[in-house]
């Protein structure tokens, strides 16, 4: 796929995201939306046995709204293990399993499959479109949830610095649970990664998402520890 064609596809997806977002706002019933805020803390360990292959384990901690005194601090924790493979420099494939423990005792199992094509616009910008298919099983409700998450992301780099900003928009589409609901929620995010050295990456990000009945603000921090056994 050449650059001009990928740009057209990316612009098409951006237009679709924008139209769906506006449609969701105009078609939603007049209900009072709740405002919620949370914090996410991520820790990942990645190992590269080959240049195009990454094995990873991760832990994500979710905290409730710290501005509400009566709210419980702990919300959920996600433990994941997976593999990321790049058959081509412009395509990434990912498969992962995630164990979730939620406040209240509910345990969930999630399987994730992703494909992410990308292309460099210039020396400083890269655009990607990621399709993520996930299945989540709730032990408490004994039910399955099938979801498709479509994300358009723009990654950048600041010349002569180890800083890498990015922005994205992501659409959550249920596949089975409610076929009449084409879009469950839409999220917009912005973040910044700091590549400290070859083995350490720090990140901070903010995400705003909205559904028919709620707004959600998420502030996150992340740390990635990387190892490799091949010569760069």
Question: How should each PLM-predicted stretch be described?
Answer:
Residues 51-57, 89-95, 122-127, 160-165, ...:
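Repeated loop/turn-to-beta-strand initiation elements of outer-membrane beta-barrel proteins
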Residues 1-30, 228-232:
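Cleavable N-terminal export/targeting peptides
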Residues 43, 81, 113-115, 150-152, ...:
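Membrane-embedded beta-strands of outer-membrane beta-barrel proteins
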Residues 57-61, 95-99, 129-135, 167-171, ...:
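Transmembrane beta-barrel strands of outer-membrane/channel proteins
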Residues 115, 217-232:
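Outer-membrane beta-barrel "beta-signal"
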Residues 26-84:
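Start-of-domain marker
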């Amino acid at each position: 796929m050449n650059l001009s064609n990928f740009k057209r596809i990316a612009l098409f997806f951006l237009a679709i995201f924008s139209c769906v977002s506006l449609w969701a706002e105009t078609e939603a019933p007049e209900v009072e939306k709740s405002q919620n805020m949370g914090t996410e803390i991520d820790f990942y360990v990645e190992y590269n046995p080959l240049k195009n292959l990454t094995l990873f384990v991760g832990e994500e901690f979710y905290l409730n709204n710290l501005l509400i005194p009566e709210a419980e601090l702990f919300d959920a924790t996600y433990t994941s293990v997976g593999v990321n493979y790049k058959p081509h420099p412009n395509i990434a494939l990912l498969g992962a399993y995630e164990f979730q423990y939620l406040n209240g005792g509910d345990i969930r199992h999630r399987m994730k499959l992703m494909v992410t094509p990308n292309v460099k616009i210039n020396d400083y910008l890269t655009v990607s479109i990621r399709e993520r298919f996930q299945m989540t099983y709730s032990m408490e409700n004994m039910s399955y949830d099938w979801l498709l998450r479509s994300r358009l992301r723009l990654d950048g780099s600041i010349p002569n610095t180890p800083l890498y900003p990015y922005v994205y928009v992501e659409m959550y589409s249920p596949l089975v649970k409610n076929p009449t609901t084409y879009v469950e929620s839409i999220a917009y995010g912005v973040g910044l990664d700091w590549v400290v050295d070859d083995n350490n990456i720090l990140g901070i990000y903010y995400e705003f998402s909205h559904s028919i009945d709620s707004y959600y603000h998420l502030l996150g921090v992340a740390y990635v520890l990387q190892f490799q056994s091949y010569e760069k």
